[in-house]
């Protein structure tokens, strides 16, 4: 996880690497998590709702046998490192804050195996 501050604004970025011989179950978890991130990004369109993002992520994760970590979530970024809104990785389509053009937030899906 890496963050920089530029002209008073924060960033938040991360990368994950698998090193050595990774158990197939762990590789699958990593692959599905990346798929969920991509699905969440696709759902995060102007005029959609944050619940649309969470629902899309949750549906794909559960379809693949994983459960969503509900205690941690994505978040807004700006002049503070963690700002509103909370971007949960579960939810109901059509609920939550409306996504407006220009909003900046993270999508950080995390799952339990099982």
Region annotations inferred by a language model:
Residues 1-114:
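Active-site neighborhoods and metal-handling regions in enzymes and metal-associated proteins
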């Amino acid at each position: 996880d890496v963050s920089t501050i530029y002209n008073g604004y924060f960033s938040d970025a991360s990368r994950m690497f698998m090193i050595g011989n990774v158990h197939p179950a762990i590789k699958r978890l990593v692959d599905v998590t990346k798929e969920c991130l991509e699905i969440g990004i696709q759902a995060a369109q102007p005029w959609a709702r944050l619940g649309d993002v969470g629902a899309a992520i949750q549906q794909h994760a559960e379809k693949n046998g994983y459960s969503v970590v509900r205690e941690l979530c994505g978040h807004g970024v700006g002049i503070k490192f963690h700002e509103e809104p909370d971007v949960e990785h579960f939810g109901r389509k059509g609920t939550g804050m409306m996504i407006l053009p220009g909003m900046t937030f993270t999508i950080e899906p995390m799952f339990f195996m099982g």
